[in-house]
């Protein structure tokens, strides 16, 4: 039904007065309906038809409204998975020395953060620690904005040692953030918060050597927040992304695209482990890991 104008109405040529068409639709059954509104005109002596496609649907649910609120003081849970192989000593030192750059965004935006650290080794002397949050010399496992001597504690935690061998961030990250480790009071209980964004930050100079395909770990990590809140999880990597290591730096193997897959699937950030400017690299990682939510997921698929 067209309201506001009668059928067969003619618009005077050269008129500058706009004509408004208001269409009303009322379904008579369930399901999709289509139609068209046709405007017949004559331009330059030639008849033309302008067709406006119409779509409608009859359903039982009616209008669905989703409401999203951005936290004024966002929360972020950050798991650092740090390569503890023999070639990582200088990289761990650089990470510790540039803590302020990593935390710059969180500090300036008053982010309520949890930071935990675990290592990559899966099969030798440090394998028992992989997936378990490390404790500092003072017994601190979870760093918070209120943690005393935060810089000292951070430097202590990220110095995970260099006695490891096989290197994987995906496997220990998944172990750390899922049951039974995440609910075990002797391991990682208290780290995850339901209303906080979650970020894994992998720091390694090697391709990921986890035994399963990346999609296996991705699905488990995404399930932590759930399909409707997938935008609350990111996977970020400081790793070996150049064809070969530049002079003065070293890789423990070249990139095999497994890191790239995890980053791209979660809208994470990747930075070069052999960067000449750790401050800038960690600042970019920090902005993404600690940042406000940028993706909001609807509860139902819209009719578009």
Regions found by a protein language model. Give the residues of each.
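Feature for long, exposed domains in two main contexts
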Residues: 1-64
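Divalent cation-coordinating acidic motifs and surrounding scaffolds
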Residues: 55-304
